[in-house]
Amino acid sequence: MSGRPRTTSFAESCKPVQQPSAFGSMKVSRDKDGSKVTTVVATPGQGPDRPQEVSYTDTKVIGNGSFGVVYQAKLCDSGELVAIKKVLQDKRFKNRELQIMRKLDHCNIVRLRYFFYSSGEKKDEVYLNLVLDYVPETVYRVARHYSRAKQTLPVIYVKLYMYQLFRSLAYIHSFGICHRDIKPQNLLLDPDTAVLKLCDFGSAKQLVRGEPNVSYICSRYYRAPELIFGATDYTSSIDMWSAGCVLAELLLGQPIFPGDSGVDQLVEIIKVLGTPTREQIREMNPNYTEFKFPQIKAHPWTKVFRPRTPPEAIALCSRLLEYTPTARLTPLEACAHSFFDELRDPNVKLPNGRDTPALFNFTTQELSSNPPLATILIPPHARIQAAASPPANATAASDTNAGDRGQTNNAASASASNST
């Protein structure tokens, strides 16, 4: 979690929020079974701002924290379950999470279906409500289940979950957006299909070179060392460090760097990676001069993990958990790593016998950071399948165009970004 209260994301613009004309209109009625039905005027998450009535029922609290409250509800028109994230809105500012989520459209990112505003109990209190895809599980809960049973998560699931996480990061990083809170709790899972969706963009920000950012960001176990060193000019590579921590945790069955404090977090990292060199410290934060840790040698990666851990998994981990931010793999490079070769096998299936989820429907936007990697990322059987399915290609093209529009909007909003 970030150091600031996450009741709302701070502004990318200091102009007052333009509330919808139907702001605050919330009708409560009963259906034929006597269940409470709430009807609001909501704006679709994507596309033009055309407010419409949305009715939902069966509301119950499924989570809360410093950010606000999350409810589960059922849409009356489709019967689909959704999650409604309710956060206190500072009327002086636009909500950064909302601005970012409206630009995103990817199979591995939780979708913003609608958003609406509602009144609070106090005078002038305004809440923003984000209506999102409901996904029943998280990587955190699934991993905890295996850990409590004294078992390790099957490697095929480690591959599927991490690959989809890297795809989601390749997508948001292509827009210059850094998530800044990658952790197992923010990776939603459908256990039947093995589809993973990245959620919680409450800490996310479009990073602009030369503009400072807060260093007290990201949950402790997953914080990149440059953040611990107080860097304010970090890049999206902090997400890749966090992803490396998630990968290591899935292989180990417990967090790899379980620090009790910021300094202790660094100690845990040094126990594995060894003491960083002066050059590595300079790469993390040129202004940091107070480094006085004892000289400790790096622990061999093969001894960090269990004896039967796949060598490719260890190799991938070592390329993510690097002190030097620029030495870490990019998300696309991670997807192309040999650890994921099994997923590119045309005969691979889920342990329950089902087909694997969509893994190769890359758009131009996703591949923009390194187009030549497409030769590895899209295996021959997927190319043949795509060529035989024009509607799928049309969807991909549509997604790409939507991504291009989002990139333009991002560039426009970046200049108004603040320094949190």
From Swiss-Prot:
EC number: 2.7.11.26, 2.7.11.1
Positions bearing Phosphotyrosine: Y216
Span of domain Protein kinase: 56-340
Active site: residue positions: D181
GO biological process per UniProt: animal organ morphogenesis; autosome genomic imprinting; axon extension; axonogenesis; bone remodeling; canonical Wnt signaling pathway; cell differentiation; cell growth involved in cardiac muscle cell development
Chain spans, region Disordered: 1-53, 385-420
A Gene Ontology molecular function term of the record: kinase activity
Biased composition (Low complexity): 386-401, 409-420
Modification Phosphoserine, positions: S9, S389
Processing after translation: Phosphorylated by AKT1 and ILK1. Upon insulin-mediated signaling, the activated PKB/AKT1 and RPS6KA3 protein kinases phosphorylate and deactivate GSK3B, resulting in the dephosphorylation and activation of GYS1. Activated by phosphorylation at Tyr-216. Inactivated by phosphorylation at Ser-9. Phosphorylated in a circadian manner in the hippocampus.
Catalytic reaction(s) noted: L-seryl-[tau protein] + ATP = O-phospho-L-seryl-[tau protein] + ADP + H(+); L-threonyl-[tau protein] + ATP = O-phospho-L-threonyl-[tau protein] + ADP + H(+); L-seryl-[protein] + ATP = O-phospho-L-seryl-[protein] + ADP + H(+); L-threonyl-[protein] + ATP = O-phospho-L-threonyl-[protein] + ADP + H(+)
SMART domains in alphabetical order: S_TKc (SM00220)
Lipid-bearing positions (S-palmitoyl cysteine): C14
Signal peptide: none
One Pfam family here: Pkinase
Coiled-coil segments: none
Family membership noted in the UniProt record: Belongs to the protein kinase superfamily. CMGC Ser/Thr protein kinase family. GSK-3 subfamily.
Function: Constitutively active protein kinase that acts as a negative regulator in the hormonal control of glucose homeostasis, Wnt signaling and regulation of transcription factors and microtubules, by phosphorylating and inactivating glycogen synthase (GYS1 or GYS2), EIF2B, CTNNB1/beta-catenin, APC, AXIN1, DPYSL2/CRMP2, JUN, NFATC1/NFATC, MAPT/TAU and MACF1. Requires primed phosphorylation of the majority of its substrates. In skeletal muscle, contributes to insulin regulation of glycogen synthesis by phosphorylating and inhibiting GYS1 activity and hence glycogen synthesis.
Miscellaneous notes: Simultaneous silencing of GSK3A and GSK3B by RNAi stimulates replication and promotes survival of INS-1E pancreatic beta cells.
PANTHER family per record: GLYCOGEN SYNTHASE KINASE-3 ALPHA (PTHR24057), GLYCOGEN SYNTHASE KINASE-3 BETA (PTHR24057:SF8)
Protein name listed in UniProt: Glycogen synthase kinase-3 beta
Classification lineage: Eukaryota, Metazoa, Chordata, Craniata, Vertebrata
